[in-house]
């Protein structure tokens, strides 16, 4: 990979915390992270490296920060106090501020099914353990419609309603 044109100070624009430089890519932050099992997986350590290396274009195209479910488990797990959840929020803010037309795929997923992550693998695991199926708003058409109507009143969805039409 050629880093000659990367912005070595990009980290200051996105997440101006010296703690970011302490990340040694151990992966402990994804321990217990529900989004780390998503498709694609949210791997905070990869995002931290991309920020440090100044990979601006790659970060613009990255949708995984939007799959974070805000559980903050990464904050508890990080041995270097990098504050991965704050990094995720800062990256989302930077992406939105630099591209007002950006509609993360997670928003489309939230509209269609009420949550950002597919739970297929979790459901298979639950079945293998003899646990009941989790309730899902997608199986409650009236509630899903109410939820979608509510979301349609938000600017990001109402101004881009073509993305949320029924297929």
Language-model segments: which ranges?
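Inter-heme linker and motif-flanking segments adjacent to c-type heme-binding CXXCH motifs
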Residues: 59
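Non-ligating segments of multi-cofactor redox enzymes
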Residues: 1-22, 28-32, 40-49, 53-56, ...
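Cysteine-centered iron-sulfur cluster-binding motifs in ferredoxin-type domains/subunits
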Residues: 19-36, 62-82
């Amino acid at each position: 990979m050629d880093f000659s044109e990367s912005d070595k100070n990009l980290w200051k624009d996105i997440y101006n915390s010296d703690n970011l430089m302490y990340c040694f890519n151990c992966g402990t932050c994804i321990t217990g992270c529900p989004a780390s099992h998503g498709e694609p997986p949210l791997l905070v350590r990869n995002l931290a490296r991309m920020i440090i290396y100044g990979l601006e274009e790659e970060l613009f195209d990255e949708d995984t920060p939007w799959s974070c479910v805000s559980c903050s488990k990464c904050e508890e797990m990080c041995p270097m106090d990098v504050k991965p959840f704050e990094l995720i929020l800062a990256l989302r803010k930077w992406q939105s501020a630099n591209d007002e037309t950006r509609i993360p795929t997670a928003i489309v997923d939230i509209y269609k099914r009420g949550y950002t992550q597919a739970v297929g693998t979790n459901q298979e695991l639950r079945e293998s353990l003899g646990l009941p199926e989790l309730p899902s708003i997608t199986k409650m058409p009236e509630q899903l419609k109410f939820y979608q109507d509510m979301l349609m009143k938000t600017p990001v969805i109402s101004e881009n309603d073509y993305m949320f039409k029924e297929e």
